[in-house]
Amino acid sequence: MDLKSGKLAWTWALSVSIALAVVYASVAAPAFASTASIIAPSDPHDPQVDSGWQAGTCNAEPPELGAATCSVATPKQFFERAAAHPNWGFTQFIVAHKAPGETPVGELKDVRVDLPVGLSVNPGATGRCPLDVFEAGASGCDAYGAKVGESMVTASTPITGSPIAPIPGVTEVNVYNVIPPEGEPARFGLELAGNEVFLKADVAYDGNYHEGFTIAVPHALPIELPLPLGLIKGLILKNRLVFNGRAGDGTFITTPSTCLGEAFTQSGSLYSTYLLAASYEEEAQAGYTFPGSAQPPFESPIPPGTSPKECGTIPYAPGLAVDPNTADVNSPSGAAVTVSVPHITGADSQDSSVTKTAQVSLPQGMGINPAAANGLQTCSNALFGEGTKNPTGCPPASKIGTVEITSPPLPEGNLSGDVFVGEQLSRDPTSGEEYRIFVDAESARYGIKVRLTGHVSANPVTGQLTTTFAETPQVPFTSFALRFNGGAHAVLSSSPTCGPNTATTAMTPWSGNPPASPSSPFTLTSLPGGGDCPKSMAARPFAPGFSLKPDSAKAGAFSPLRLHLTRSDGQQELKGADLLLPPGMVGKLAGIPYCSEAALAAAAASGGRAEAGSSSCPGASLVGSATVSAGTGPQPLQIQGKVFLSGPYHGAPLSLAVVTPATAGPFDLGTAVVRVALFLEPETAQVHAVSDPIPDVFGGTQLSIRAIDVELDRKEFTLNPTSCSPLDTTGMAKGGGADPTNPAAFSSFAVNAPFQTTECERLDFKPKLFTRLFGKRKSTRRTQHPKFRATLVARAGDANIARAAVTLPHSEFLEQSHIRTICTRVQLAAQDCPKASIYGYARAKTPLLDDELAGPVYLVSSSHELPDMLVDLRGQVDVRLRGVISAVAGRIKTVFNPVPDVPVSKFVLTMKGGKKGLLVNSRNLCTAPAFSNLNFKAQNRKQLRVKRLPLRVPGCKKHGRHRGRR
């Protein structure tokens, strides 16, 4: 409150919170005199009727006839009803004085009063008097209904020490609610002996938001007394200020709704009022500043035995309204979220409790939109400045919305501002520290700022968002509205179905009563771009786009291979793929080490930026890259990843690991590792790729993946087929279906990518086959069972074999009596063929692998007259060659069809002799040369026929060593 030149001064205050007391108590003792040097003694632990400082709320003022004045010494007169409107509120201070009489020890200059947290003075409850009307004469304010209380002032002179007043006795004047100047939330004024006196209000938005008042007291003017005294100064000795708590609409003063129990009330200073004061003499000292140098403050607690009453009946019926601001499902949403709390008028009514904690959960499926990260910045705690009076310095690119708060003490629309993204402090989406929002609302007109931090917890599986504003200021509001930015970079995506989609809350009042849980359902009406709105998750459409092709289609050539999988907004999530590549579309694994399981685990545990800067997998295992387009709307976020070759996985002999550092603008969500198991169809060597479920939520962010692009571009890694036939990649794309968190509920969509090589007819086809028997001279005789070996040699760059048929000479029959044990279909499927079914061995060398493949040759069950021959090659990958054995014109013929379209530089097949030998000589082999027939067909349809392929026989003198054609 200001005093113009020559005016007396006084103050009014009620109570202040324990939080303020802690702050004051922590201030280092100044070198100057404190409040105790100007205000009469006051012991908060032993309050007396003549204590230098006291304040409170009363049932009656002035008291009934014969009753004592309401003071800390009259607890029965105190108003104890919580969240209600006291009949009266009073403050009283007495200036320290000395003999003779009551001579003040100094001239009061400044007074500071801090009210309790939660006690609200509502200047909007009454009319407000224009300042020019007040200055023309305070009584003119009566016409505006602006009277809110009375002031009683007693003055004393330093000469006589006798109490005086401008008018004999105690001076009483009306106090009016005056329209405050720019930058003040409220101002109250009174006119004393023709002088204007003001109380200037403020709100401690740099602390606990309690209300306070400041008075600047000018020098006292001389008072003319009868001679011989003449002119003397009248100094303030005592002031009692009484406010009508039910002025206007009855809600001028509202007691705190905080109810923490009587034990806490009596042990703490929750409902205390604090006073700081200083004299002219003190403030004349160099370096003295008010109120800092006046610490510590005087405390006026509520009287012993008093505490808030009727806590259980404090109303609390908050409301919630959520508007997605879009009619489309799975689209950018500039959502508006409004929490409301009724302001209950009426002098005899309890007002609504102030909200302690507001927790709002958006519907599942309405989550963070990664597209918002494009160009996004975050705001640090220091730049936000919560708990300070520093200007908010959040960068413009961190703004994601606006806020508007309506509070009963302020005209509607006067408290508004911006919503910013807070700096990430954690990678745990459930912590509320990974995602934070900073709310900065202010009113320059009324000098109030509200800075709040909302902690956003994101479900790591579903992406559902729950925002919590905890321990909110005990300041009443009727509406708290957040409006998030929409458009291409909207921070939220709308729900995936029509709904009703329901937002829920858990609203906890300061009263200590049970939380309230208002909810807000809303519906959507259409798919993005048109179409019927899906009523359930399973009803959502799913028709992804798909392509897989090499950069070059040249047959037998190495070429980068590209996969493209895409979906539109509104469709089911992309959850994976199960693909069978064309025969012959394979990879060269030679020289490539695996990224180990330990390295992949380290990648999954590392931050995205750390992984992007230094991959956990060795560079030597890198085979390609991946790009993920994430987010709803026209400008999804592009996220880059790497593809590494890895080892066995989920029963597959090897795998790919797609390692994607999940960095989105300023956010680091960690590193996503998605494995793709690479099976090999054993009889065609076709690659069968089966991905893990692709996360649709990562780090709590709902990814809304729009496209996945994988490029396998390592030099000489992916190899084209040598076939000229039309080929295709077939398989299934997996959608989120009825529940994107449950693979059993996924949907499937058949995909197909046709492919045909070029220039395949230019490939040569010139393989060579050598056959021979092993053993001593005896093994060449009739009825003997020689050991047999066939060796195939192929040239690099030729077309691969598609079918191989070899017919042995008439000299070699099948010894059916030696076919004793055959591997059954069941045993073969279980890879548990008995040892006795092994009749030979084979090995193969391919330029695609570092090591050769090798394994046994079985006789297996078949649908033919004779058992089939199965060559079971094992190694880095496993391949099976099935040969159909038959008798043609008295000769043994074996046909391998199909033969995988993969390059083989050398293949050696060795069949046992002796007791396990399947061949028996029909004559003495040394009597004449023996020739086989060869019929090879290439993948590009070229053929190689040899009718007289020599069989090399050991031990014959004349022709047994004939090596034949090559």
Task: Go through each PLM region and give its residues.
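Sec-dependent, cleavable N-terminal signal peptides
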Residues: 1-33
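Ser/Thr/Pro/Gly-rich, low-complexity intrinsically disordered stalk/linker tracts of secreted
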Residues: 32-966
